[in-house]
C-alpha cells in the first residue's frame, strides 16, 4: 500500500493487523526505504477489540467469515485465507490471471467485510457499562432487569447458564440473574487487593484481613472476589445502585459463559 491511501484517515482499521499485518509491512517499508504510512496514526484492531464477544455471541472462532456469518452476511464467493496461501504459492510459479483474481477477490472481500463487522462494536457497551437500567423486578428467585443501549445491535442474541440469562435485540438487553436466598454477588475488579474467606464465601480487603489465620483465607481471584447483598426494595428502586452493581458484575457473569 502507498502512504496516500492512509492519509485522510487518522485511525486505521484492521483485523489481526497489530500482530501480523502491520509488523510485516513495517519490516518491508524499512527494508525498501519506504516511509511508513502508520507513523503517527492510531490503530483499531477489530480482532483484539471484539475478542471478548466470542463466548457471549457463541462464535465458533474470531475469524472474519465467522463474524460475518453471525451478522447474516453470506455472500462470500472466494477462497478462505488458508486456501489463498496455497494459491499465492502457486501464483509465484505460474503468474496466471485466474489465480491472481482469486487472491485479489479474497482480499477485497476481507477489506469490505471490515466495514460490515464494525457494527459489532456496539455489543461492547454491555461490557463497558454504557447503558441505562430502565426496569427492575424481583420475582422471589431472580432479579429481572431491562437495559437500554445507546446503539442498535446489528443482530439479536441470547446466552446464559445456571447463574444468569440475557437476551439482546435492537437497543434493549433483558437480563435475569438468579439469587441465592434473595441475595446477589457483588464482584470487584481489584481482586488482588482482597482475601477470599472460603468458610464465609466472601472477600475482605487485605488491609483488614492480614490478621486472619492463613488457613482461613486465600488470595482472591476474578471468580471469587465478591461480597453478598440483599435484593432489597431500596436496591430495586434505585437505578444508580443497580448500575453500580452491574458495571463490573455483568462482565464477570459473561466471563462464566462457555465458548462454543
What are these regions (language model features)?
Residues 1-260:
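DEDD superfamily 3′-5′ metal-dependent exonuclease/proofreading module
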Amino acid at each position: 500500500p502507498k502512504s496516500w491511501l492512509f492519509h485522510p484517515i487518522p485511525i486505521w482499521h484492521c483485523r489481526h493487523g497489530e500482530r501480523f499485518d502491520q509488523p510485516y509491512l513495517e519490516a518491508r517499508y524499512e527494508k525498501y526505504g519506504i516511509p511508513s504510512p502508520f507513523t503517527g496514526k492510531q490503530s483499531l484492531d477489530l480482532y483484539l477489540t471484539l475478542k471478548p464477544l466470542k463466548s457471549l455471541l457463541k462464535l465458533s472462532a474470531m475469524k472474519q467469515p465467522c463474524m460475518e456469518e453471525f451478522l447474516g452476511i453470506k455472500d462470500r464467493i472466494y477462497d478462505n485465507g488458508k486456501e489463498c496461501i496455497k494459491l499465492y504459492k502457486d501464483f509465484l510459479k505460474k503468474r496466471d490471471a485466474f489465480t491472481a483474481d482469486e487472491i485479489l477477490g479474497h482480499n477485497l472481500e476481507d477489506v469490505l467485510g471490515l466495514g460490515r463487522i464494525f457494527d459489532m462494536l456496539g455489543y461492547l457497551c454491555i461490557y463497558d457499562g454504557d447503558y441505562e437500567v430502565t426496569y427492575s423486578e424481583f420475582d422471589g428467585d431472580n432479579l429481572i432487569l431491562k437495559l437500554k443501549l445507546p446503539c442498535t445491535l446489528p443482530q439479536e442474541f441470547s446466552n446464559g447458564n445456571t447463574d444468569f440469562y440475557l437476551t439482546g435485540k435492537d437497543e434493549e438487553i433483558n437480563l435475569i440473574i438468579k439469587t441465592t436466598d434473595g441475595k446477589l454477588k457483588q464482584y470487584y475488579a481489584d481482586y488482588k487487593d482482597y482475601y477470599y474467606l472460603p468458610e464465609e464465601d466472601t472477600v475482605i480487603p487485605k488491609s483488614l484481613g492480614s490478621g486472619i489465620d492463613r488457613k482461613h483465607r486465600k488470595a482472591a481471584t476474578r471468580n471469587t472476589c465478591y461480597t453478598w447483598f440483599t435484593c432489597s426494595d431500596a436496591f430495586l428502586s434505585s437505578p444508580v445502585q443497580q448500575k453500580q452493581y452491574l458495571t463490573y458484575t455483568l462482565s464477570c457473569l459473561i466471563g462464566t459463559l462457555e465458548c462454543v
